Amino acid sequence: MDSSGKYNAAKLALELVKDGMVLGIGSGSTVEVFLNLLGDKIREEGLEIYGIPSSYQSYFAAIRNGVEIVDLVEFEPDLCIDGADQVDAKLNCIKGGGGAMTREKIVAKASRKVVIIVDESKLVEKLSMPVPVEVLPFAYGWVLREIEKMGCKARLREGKGKIGPVITDNGNFVVDCDFGVIEEDRVEGLEGEIKLISGVVENGIFSKELIDAVIAGSSRSARFL
């Protein structure tokens, strides 16, 4: 797979990073590309960058690249850089392919500015991929029945490299909920409706109100949306 789109999006996002910044760090392959580029910049320019990672993946990648790890108790992120699995024409996103959507959303909401970086192949007219929902294991059966009443096909995400379900960094299950095409005027409402089900921790819908900008990368360049 050609990764130049991810590289170009990450490279443009790097221009937003200034010495002394506290970064909210999302998760996923594009964020890892960003962190590798950031590591080069830290080494070359002697920058001090602080980071609040949203997953073990980004935690280890940040440490490896010279980012000093801090937390939300003492720090408010100046800028959150994260990826997405789909971005619609209004900049609504679906995230959670890696199961880190709960901490990603917390870090994003705590940040002063949120920038999503994606390969342009993630851009769609309307959201349509299954929505990841983090669920307490105790409530799994109940949540599955309730969420299917909302008109979706729901399935427990199975692990790869292990037997049984995917377990999030928070110790919970992930249920992937296929609502088909999600119309733009339903996105924010659907995000809230899912969260009202007892036992749901969070879901992977990131409505446009949370997003300040999206950077989309192609094989030749990147642009702000």
From Swiss-Prot:
Protein keywords: Isomerase
User: A single Pfam family, by name?
Assistant: Rib_5-P_isom_A
What domain of life is recorded for the organism?
Answer: Archaea
Disulphide bridges in this chain?
A: none
Q: Where is the active site?
A: E104
Enzymatic reactions: aldehydo-D-ribose 5-phosphate = D-ribulose 5-phosphate
EC numbers: 5.3.1.6
Coiled coil location: none
Q: Which GO terms describe its biological process?
A: D-ribose metabolic process; pentose-phosphate shunt, non-oxidative branch
Q: Which GO terms describe its cellular component?
A: cytosol
Which pathway or pathways does this protein act in?
Answer: Carbohydrate degradation; pentose phosphate pathway; D-ribose 5-phosphate from D-ribulose 5-phosphate (non-oxidative stage): step 1/1
Q: What Gene Ontology molecular-function terms does this entry list?
A: ribose-5-phosphate isomerase activity
Q: Which residues bind substrate?
A: S27, G28, S29, T30, D82, G83, A84, D85, K95, G96, G97, G98, K122
Relate the assembly described in the record. Homodimer.
State the function annotated in the UniProt record. Catalyzes the reversible conversion of ribose-5-phosphate to ribulose 5-phosphate.
> So what family is this one in?
Belongs to the ribose 5-phosphate isomerase family.
Protein's name according to its UniProt entry: Ribose-5-phosphate isomerase A
Gene symbol here is rpiA
